[in-house]
Amino acid sequence: MLCGMLLFFSYGLRFQAQENGAPRTYDVRGTVINSTTHEPIARALVTIAGQESSSSQLTDNEGRFEFPNVRAGGCTLQARRPGFFGSNFSRDLSLPVEVGPDIHEHTLALTPAGTITGQITLPASDPGGNIRVQLMRRNLQEGLALWQPVAMKMTNSEGAFRFGGLQPGEYKLTTDSTIDPDVPSARVSVRWGFPPASYPEEGDSNASGALKINPGQQVNVQMALTRTPFYPVTISIAGKVTPGFSAQIFDGMSRAYAATLFLRAQQQGLYAWLPAGNYTAIIQSFSPNMPPGYASEPLTVRDAPVHADGPVILPVHPISVSIRKEFTSPVNNSGAQIVRIENGRQVIEPPADVNLVLISATDGNNTGGNLRHEPGGDDSSWQLENVLPGKYWVQPYANQGYVASITAGGTDLARDPLVIGPGGASAPIDIVLRNDTATLSVRLKTTGSASEAGEDQPHGYLYLLPQFDSSFVMQRVMISAQISYLPNIPPGTYHAFALDREMDLEYRNPKALEAYTGKGQIITMEPNGTTNLQIDVVPAEAEQ
């Protein structure tokens, strides 16, 4: 009788606590697994972050975790482990969950990292030690596929090297040139060494030949270097050499060779040792309160010493930029100002309405478009400074409204690269801004079964690709069965599709987008209007 009264009393207290608004709690359980092998991952760090607090623990030998007494409501589970990647190959995997009476166990899948090991072999008995090896990865940046450096290692005493912690993708390896360390006399016309080598071997650094690494894959490569004669190359430089002088020599695959500056009585120039082949010498100078200087010189080495009369280093002049606003509604002018120092005095001016990012079409390096008011010009007159000659993709970012068009002469920079000649020669850049933006109301199509409490909500990643020449592309925006409103979209016709995982698209390459032809929907966004979209999730194709 007493036991029954105590049980009734205990139940009554819990019922009374729930009636009085005390929080309900539930256990959150799950497993962390390898996304490739589906095996459990032990000692993965799992964190649960709720509305007011967070807690962490390591998984057991079966990859399991359990957080007791978690308050009902929304929270996020995060998992990480050295040697693995999470969402979009970041360090953590994040999963939003809803804690409630119907909560189920969760599975967190981490992607294993790949590894490249290799061996450098040289002729005869040389072990190939202390050779610099550069790892390049094919990255996507602003819709462009670019080969960019990832890491550098030196071979050990046996000529071996290792690159670990690699995310899936395409890679290449290159070695630096090396020359025998003996010091030649002034009249020596040849030295021996090893020119750069690449793996896989190819003639074009942007060709398709690459080393593909899948999740968790371990690859071993062998690279053989060939002993080759190097010949002295001298390039005379006209004009005064400034303290901020630099020079490099590149072969046809954009691999750099060392070059040194020499200063003699009435002569100055570059000195280098190169094997037979075709090259380009790039010379740059930087001085305070002066525009940068630039020059390039093509070289051909044919099994003999070379002496070239180098080019004159020309100052890089600014490019005129016109920004015209065709706004149909008032804008909020915050009155922000930029303060800079010019010739020892303070200059105050409003910020530009557009930020420009220039991406080299040859090596993928970024340069910020330093816009400043054109002296004596009106509010629409600007200058793009300190951009060296070359070919660049231009990505504009409007601070208000959107970029309706961006051109340079007859070149549409939303479609084609900007070409800057010697001395910064380029047609003026014309930018038109508008603010009659559209809004997209979007949600996923669902069967309705996934909306029950405790179940993970379906989600996808929305991509909007303009079917007209535009610098605007929306990608990797998470959407769910709940309506999301996406404002500030330039009006026009778009190809809309939602993928089951987030990935960057090579959207400037029509061939890379062929896999998504016929998937998703074609929608039209009207100026100042709202477009409603219900869309299905489609599988993401393998990385291009």
Language model features with spans:
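Long luminal/extracellular ectodomains of secretory-pathway precursor proteins
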Residues: M1-Q544
